[in-house]
Each structure stands twice: as structure tokens, then as C-alpha cells.
Amino acid sequence: MTLVLSFALVGCNVFPFLQNNPAQQATQSSITTGEIEAIHEPKFGGSYLDITIEEFNNLGFEYGDSVDVTFSNGYKLSDIPYYNGYYTKTNEPLVVAYPGYPYIDVCINNGEPLWETAGLKAGDTATVTLHEKQKYATVQKALDATYTNNRSDYASDEVFANFRPMKGGNLAEGVVYRSASPIDNQNNRAPYAADLAQRCGVQFILDLADTNEEIQGYYQNADYDITWHQSLYDVGNVAALNLNANYRGGQYAYRLVAGLREIILHKGPYLIHCTEGKDRTGFVCALLEALCGASYDEMRDDYMITYDNYYGINEKDDKARYDAVVDVKFDDIARCIAGVPTYGSLDGADYAAGARKYLTDVGMTEWEINKLVERLTNK
């Protein structure tokens, strides 16, 4: 299976038998949730639907189906995919049953908050109806990936915690690390990430995921030793940015710049993390690598270590899925950094210049950027 094939098939009549069988069509049309409550998901701005993943699937929906979502205020999303992960490209809508989520989520992947875009308010409802059976099955199968939260399933603490030093371009060795969260233990990785960071001498943490209130909540409910993390937090060496997933949005960039200014003011080594150390961390680390002169290959290789750590997806053992992730996930990050349109070519892209422009566009000065680069490169 090639990358082009996997995505080209989505728009073709891959399953003609579904359209030619009246009995099957009748069965499909009966698959619906009926009206269910829409719930604001404030972190990323999507809309939870008041139905669990298990309940939703028991109605007859399957990953890879095409569905229609109609909200009670009249806003409608037609012919969108239902996946168990964020497998659409940036700014494309989907219904997602992300492992560990309490409910089904309707959102715009890495885009503007659907709740606001759709004009939703408390008390609104949504109805999900099957549009076409398994229309998006090719993408679902290519990108389907889940992970466990059991340390014994992974080769090392570093793999389990998705912990590693950042590399590429002129980045200095041992100055910046990245990982899963060392404080939010919902995925059982926090103790391992914290221990590894402490052993590497981390002095400042850029927390992309949390608010200060959420960090305080983790302290109050911690089931492991949080002394090291709290010692940094208490002296102002943890910056909580509470980023959403829309790295093309102004709010994301403004908050990120505020955090990068904190790096300028504090000595390293530094740790950058979100919850999994995958999406928000993936973008921010690629941006900083680009700023320090990293090539496309260096940024991609670092980004894709995460998919090997969590899912065993790597170029050697699973090239088709590796290429699919690069196409859907990393290449959009590369385009954003380079200032290339969403579906534009990356040929000849200047990532260092693009990274600078990304930051100056939201008010970071050239002097500040140069100081940041000095911190990251020890030059």
C-alpha cells in the first residue's frame, strides 16, 4: 500500500456494493444516535456528545464510516469520517473516539474551535447519522494506532515516557529534552518522565498542556513523589501555557511566545512536554529545531520517534504507515513552519526563516529570537 493509494481511495467508489444493495442501504439509514446533548470540550474547543464510545459503536457505527452530524441550531457537518484517532489533515472535521476519552468528540482537527465555529451553546443537541459505510476505511486502517499505559509493554523507561534529548541543526547536546507529562499521570508516565528529567538535570519546564490550576490539582491528587516538580514550580521554573492543538491559530502562537520568553530568562537544561509529548510537543520542538537550523529530515526523524515509541511505527518495519503519518501529521507541521499553504509543496522550503517569521508575526523580536537561539545552542 502506498501513501498515494491510501488517500486516493478515500474519494473513490471503493465499496460499490454498499450503494447497489437496497437492503444494506435501509440498514445504514437506520443507524443514528437520535438527539443527544452536545457538551463543550474547553481544552481544544470541540464538542463532546453525551454518549460513550462503546454506546456509540453498539449502535452500528464503525471506525472508517462516513457520518453526518446535525446540531439543533441548524449547523451541519456532512460526509465526515469517524476514526479512533485524529487522522484527518489540519482544518478538516471528524468524529473521533480517542482511546481514554469519556465521550465521542466532534471537532476540527488542529483548527478553530468547532464549538465557536458552529455557534453552539449549552443545551444544544446533536444527531449523528451514518452517511456511508466504511467510506474512510483505507485511512482508518493505515493510521489506526493505539498504545498501552503499562510500563512492561515498552523496552525502556525512555521509550515509555517518550523521553529524549532534542537534536538537529545547531542544537547543543543535553540542553533541551522532550517527553510525556512529568506531572499529569493519566497515562501512568509521569513518574518515569519526572525521574528521567531530574536525572538529566532539568532546571526549567515548558508545560504546553496545563494551566496553573491544573498543576495544583495534580499536586493535590498525586499518587507518586512530586517533590522535584514542585520544587521547580515553587521558584517559578515551570511555565504553564495551556495550548490548544491549533498551531496555525493566533492564540496558540501568542501563548507559545510567552513561554519561549521564559526560556530566555531561565537557565537550562529545559524540558518541553504536553500530555503525551506527541502533538503540541511535536510542533514546538520542530519549530525550535528549525530555528536552530535543522533540516526537514532531522525534524521529521525526531518527530517520528514518538510514533515508534508509542505505536512501533517506523520506516524500517512499517513503511506504509510511517509514510501515512508523515503525510497527514508531520508535513503539515513542516508547511506551517515554512509558511507554505496547507497543500503546498515543501520543495526549497527555508525552515529557519519560516520559524523566525512564525514568531515575529506574533510580536517576538529578532533580539529575543537570537537570545532564544543562544540558549538552545550554547552559542
What kind of feature is each model-predicted range?
Residues 3-9:
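Hydrophobic core
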Residues 15-25, 110-112, 116-270, 284-379:
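Cys-dependent protein tyrosine phosphatase-like superfamily
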Residues 21-110, 114-129:
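Long, compositionally biased stretches
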Residues 271, 275:
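Active-site cradle of extracellular carbohydrate-active enzymes
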